[in-house]
UniProtKB/Swiss-Prot annotation:
Subunit-structure text: Homomultimerizes to form the nucleocapsid. May bind host exportin-1/XPO1. Binds to viral genomic RNA. Protein-RNA contacts are mediated by a combination of electrostatic interactions between positively charged residues and the phosphate backbone and planar interactions between aromatic side chains and bases.
Protein name (record): Nucleoprotein
Key words, A-Z: Capsid protein, Helical capsid protein, Host nucleus, Host-virus interaction, Ribonucleoprotein, RNA-binding, Viral nucleoprotein, Viral penetration into host nucleus, Virion, Virus entry into host cell
Bipartite nuclear localization signal, short sequence motif: residues: 198-216
Motif (Unconventional nuclear localization signal): 1-18
Species of provenance: Influenza A virus (strain A/Swine/Tennessee/24/1977 H1N1)
Source organism superkingdom: Viruses
A UniProt-annotated Pfam family: Flu_NP
Post-translational modification: Late in virus-infected cells, may be cleaved from a 56-kDa protein to a 53-kDa protein by a cellular caspase. This cleavage might be a marker for the onset of apoptosis in infected cells or have a specific function in virus host interaction.
UniProt family annotation: Belongs to the influenza viruses nucleoprotein family.
């Protein structure tokens, strides 16, 4: 990364901070985490949740969604201007699950958004603490990435469903800022751009007038974000072309799909952060942990240590496997939906199975499901080792990947080969190679074809014992490369529907 000097670290993006040294960054991230924890404790008090109920991940998600909704200014404004029957724009709520006479009961609660904003600000030293809100959004996004497939969304924009490893962060709201942009995959941003271009094709006023000027600025900004994720000059040059186009249309859509595909081999830099449910931070604060004083990092050992001694519960449907539910949440906590299963399994110290083999649906429970028939069980979120989260895509060598997902996006900085199915990826590049980007396309295809095993594996650090907090003795795991490495293999998960 040549431009390292101009890049702010995630943690700075995360906390909106200026240049800070490592200790200051750890302190400001700690302040953000502590604020989420204090908010959660206060909400549990207001809702009169027992200790057990406060540790229920479904309750945590409801409380998290309420605070996100309370601060969603654009939507709040929209709701006030377009009143719909039965929706009070000033209130927010959701299902809270309580244990009554040995059974779980669902209670729908409603709360003033103003009241929730007050509790949140009070927990965050009177500030709006947008960094904390973004952090919660990223946790929800990571949970969606591990739970749902985006096949329909990919197909709609003309991409191939097997490119799912590029779709990290595809459900993040627009308002998630720089920290949100850092964790979005190449496919996610390409898809947002394609949607914009399609609107421009169908609506001639899209790029015109005062609004159109703002749209254009957003378009160019998004192009620059995507350009910044690519690591090769040819990919970046092609992004310049897309950005500078006077009147973006089908040629640009083609270019974006081409670039997204190329990222399966010439991977982009996508940040990974471990964002945990609010109840985990609440438990730690309640037990006297001072995050700001101790400092905290989203990409180091801290989240692993936190999960080692947190007990979180989840409702389990009658035919679900609690171990599988735990795996789903573990992957979400570490942003590992697109990581090689062998790496995740080694770090976790348990076999990690592909999603098609999981006997579990999502964590959230629909309003028409019968809660009384459900039990709760402890989520096993501990790990055997820890590893630093990566922000680079690494590079790849030739290796078998699978039918459902033809590449991985590394989460952990662990040295290994990265699987991808060269024949499948390259087959997509036959055909259209003329026009203004032809020389760049040729160059990109040449780089992909010459992707050699030895120079293109992912150079990581290795994993560490949990007692090795300073990351001094890396253990480089060896993986059985004949095994299946991707999570989305033979997939049968539900689609993500807003």
């Amino acid at each position: 990364m040549a431009s390292q000097g101009t890049k702010r670290s995630y943690e700075q993006m995360e906390t909106g901070g200026e240049r800070q040294d490592a200790t200051e960054i750890r302190a400001s991230v700690g302040r953000m985490i502590g604020g989420i924890g204090r908010f959660y404790i206060q909400m549990c008090t207001e809702l009169k949740l027992s200790d057990y109920e406060g540790r229920l991940i479904q309750n945590s998600i409801t409380i998290e969604r309420m605070v996100l909704s309370a601060f969603d200014e654009r939507r709040n404004k929209y709701l006030e201007e377009h009143p719909s029957a039965g929706k009070d724009p000033k209130k927010t709520g959701g299902p809270i699950y309580r244990r009554v006479d040995g059974k779980w009961m669902r209670e729908l609660i409603l709360y003033d958004k103003e009241e929730i904003r007050r509790v949140w600000r009070q927990a965050n030293n009177g500030e709006d603490a947008t960094a904390g809100l973004t952090h919660i959004m990223i946790w929800h996004s990571n949970l969606n990435d591990a739970t749902y497939q985006r096949t329909r969304a990919l197909v709609r924009t003309g991409m191939d469903p097997r490119m799912c490893s590029l779709m990290q962060g595809s459900t993040l709201p627009r308002r998630s800022g720089a920290a949100g942009a850092a964790v979005k995959g190449v496919g996610t941003i390409a898809m947002e751009l394609i949607r914009m271009i399609k609107r421009g094709i169908n609506d001639r006023n899209f790029w015109r007038g005062e609004n159109g000027r703002r749209t254009r600025i957003a378009y160019e900004r998004m192009c620059n974000i995507l350009k910044g994720k690519f690591q090769t000059a040819a990919q970046r040059a092609m992004m310049d072309q897309v950005r500078e186009s006077r009147n973006p249309g089908n040629a640009e859509i083609e270019d974006l799909i081409f670039l997204a595909r190329s990222a399966l081999i010439l991977r982009g830099s996508v940040a990974h952060k471990s964002c945990l449910p609010a109840c985990v931070y609440g438990l730690a604060v309640a037990s006297g942990h001072d995050f700001e004083r101790e400092g905290y990092s989203l990409v180091g050992i801290d989240p692993f240590k936190l999960l080692q001694n947190s007990q979180v519960f989840s409702l389990i449907r009658p035919n679900e496997n609690p171990a599988h539910k735990s795996q789903l949440v573990w992957m979400a906590c570490h942003s590992a939906a697109f990581e090689d299963l062998r790496v995740s399994g080694f770090i976790r110290g348990k076999k990690v199975v592909p999603r098609g083999k999981l006997s579990t649906r999502g964590v959230q429970i629909a309003s028409n499901e019968n809660v009384e028939a459900m039990d709760s069980s402890t989520l096993e979120l501990r790990s055997r080792y820890w590893a630093i989260r990566t922000r680079s895509g690494g590079n790849t060598n030739q290796q078998k990947a699978s039918a459902g997902q033809i590449s991985v996006q590394p989460t952990f900085s662990v040295q290994r080969n990265l699987p991808f199915e060269r024949a499948t990826v390259m087959a997509a590049f036959i055909g259209n190679n003329e026009g203004r980007t032809s020389d760049m396309r040729t160059e990109i295809i040449r780089m992909m074809e010459s992707a050699k095993p030895e120079d293109l594996s992912f150079q990581g650090r290795g994993v560490f014992e949990l007692s090795d907090e300073k990351a001094t003795n890396p253990i480089v795991p060896s993986f059985d490369m004949n095994n299946e490495g991707s999570y989305f293999f033979g997939d049968n998960a539900e689609e993500y529907d807003n």
